[in-house]
Amino acid sequence: MILHAQAKHGKPGLPWLVFLHGFSGDCHEWQEVGEAFADYSRLYVDLPGHGGSAAISVDGFDDVTDLLRKTLVSYNILDFWLVGYSLGGRGAMMAACQGLAGLCGVIVEGGHPGLQNAEQRAERQRSDRQWAQRFRTEPLTAVFADWYQQPVFASLNDDQRRELVALRSNNNGATLAAMLEATSLAVQPDLRANLSARTFAFYYLCGERDSKFRALAAELAADCHVIPRAGHNAHRENPAGVIASLAQILRF
């Protein structure tokens, strides 16, 4: 089994750019940014429970890494960068720390490196279980209306929230709930030590209005790019800013 993805081919000799979306996104999420790099071959992946991979379920990040590895092999991708946002960023960090042959580096936007104590994990598990129950049982428009009121999305205005609620409500609530629980921060290990000892290039992107993840970025041994005029979802709020940072990283 492999993950559904959309592949766009560029010039030979350059590494692939493999894009991983955030929770409730899909393979289209990164395309505005990715298509600015047409010289590179691009793979836009649907994570389990999302988009064309909605029917695929996992028990945790080990399964996600295994599926990603098999997907890369199926496309004969031997040399690549992982670019991930939020959930996709966490998946990228996990996979990179577990080891992926051919990995050039990891570019993470707003991805959490992991909680650091049992109390934080227990609190997050309670929260994610409550959200998962709502995703399973309530209309998605109502759930996402509340989801985007969370503090991490404070930089969004009302129009941006309405647009995101409409977009994300096309998902399957049951498969979102399953993925939320399987990849909760409550079950993700703290990756700080692994990232400090890494053997791959590691870059971190965060919006200038995303105070939580700017603080987290400061804890990581990563080259951090702050995206102006953006909050947590920087590639959506300021795609040109993210394109500029990726171009600098890739020396495009």
Swiss-Prot record:
Its UniProt pathway annotation is: Quinol/quinone metabolism; 1,4-dihydroxy-2-naphthoate biosynthesis; 1,4-dihydroxy-2-naphthoate from chorismate: step 3/7; Quinol/quinone metabolism; menaquinone biosynthesis
- Pfam families per the record? Abhydrolase_6
Enzyme class, UniProt record, top EC level: lyase
Q: Which NCBIfam families match?
A: menH_SHCHC, PRK11126.1
The cross-references to HAMAP family, in alphabetical order and at most eight, read: MenH
Question: Which family, according to UniProt?
Answer: Belongs to the AB hydrolase superfamily. MenH family.
Query: How would you summarize the oligomeric state and partners of this protein?
Result: Monomer.
User: Which protein is depicted?
Assistant: 2-succinyl-6-hydroxy-2,4-cyclohexadiene-1-carboxylate synthase
From what organism does this protein derive? Shigella boydii serotype 18 (strain CDC 3083-94 / BS512)
